[in-house]
Amino acid sequence: MFKRLLITLGGTLMVLAGAVRAEVDPSYTVVLLTENFPPYNMAVNGKNFAQEENINGIAVDIVKEMFKRAGINYSLTLRFPWARIYKMGLEQPGYGVFCTARLPERENDFKWVGPLGPDDWVMLAKADSNIVLTSLEEARQYKIGAYKGDAIALTLAKQGLAPLVVLRDQDNAQKLMEGQIDLWATGDPAGRYLARQVGVTGLKTVLRFNSAQLYLALNKDVSDDIVAKLQAALDQLRKEGVVDEIMGRYL
């Protein structure tokens, strides 16, 4: 009987030890970086640098509530340019970046939480453009503008379309109107929102060539326990209708 008691006690201690290991260090803080990518993430004042409560948007509101529900500390900074932010998320332990497309070639570079929302990939042209496209291959003959470091630009380059990239995606709207490019490869609704910010309206979609899901990408150093807690919190938010409610504020 004493032997059985020891075995039972030992099993209980193992369970308790596992529970302790699963607890997140209360002092641990995830360093979150984002960019101006409306309506998902944006600085309240429209600038290229903001922190904490001075950042809003669909993904920002979801991520803030997700971390709150999971009981995990975070800091949040909006910076520029995206290529630099992405590199920091890739290389810095304890960092995370959002929102970014979860592509097969990126799968093993991060730990992922999401999806936070959809992002259709489109080719936009001026309202009076005569360009008609049925495939990406047909776009090869045109000058295409894209956003440096973005999944869309990377995908186009991989397929040999050689996009002309810029550090601010809204600059492509102006380049389009000035005739410096024929097409703008961007996300929808983000592209139209950015275009309006620089006074460009009436752009037309000549091709919709992909539909991606946007995620929070965490550095691989972030523990699996934290990733699981965040994913569980997001799943619960979606189940409760909170994600839809947040999207309704902006769209």
Language-model features: locations:
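Bacterial N-terminal signal peptides
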Residues: T8-A17
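Extracytoplasmic small-molecule ligand-binding "clamshell" domains
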Residues: V24-A101, N108, A146
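Ligand-binding clefts/hinges and TM-proximal coupling segments of bilobed small-molecule sensing domains
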Residues: P26, A151-L164, D235-L251
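Periplasmic-binding protein-like
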Residues: T34-F37, D119-V122, R196-Q231
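Bilobed "Venus flytrap"/periplasmic-binding protein-like clamshell domains
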Residues: P38, E52-E65, K126-Q159, V165-L167, ...
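Extended ligand-binding regions for polar small-molecule ligands
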Residues: G57-R69, L216-Y250
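Short helices/loops that flank or line small-molecule/ion binding pockets
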Residues: K68-A70, L78-R79, A83-Y95, K111, ...
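Acidic, polar ligand-binding/catalytic clefts
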Residues: T77-E138, G149, L207
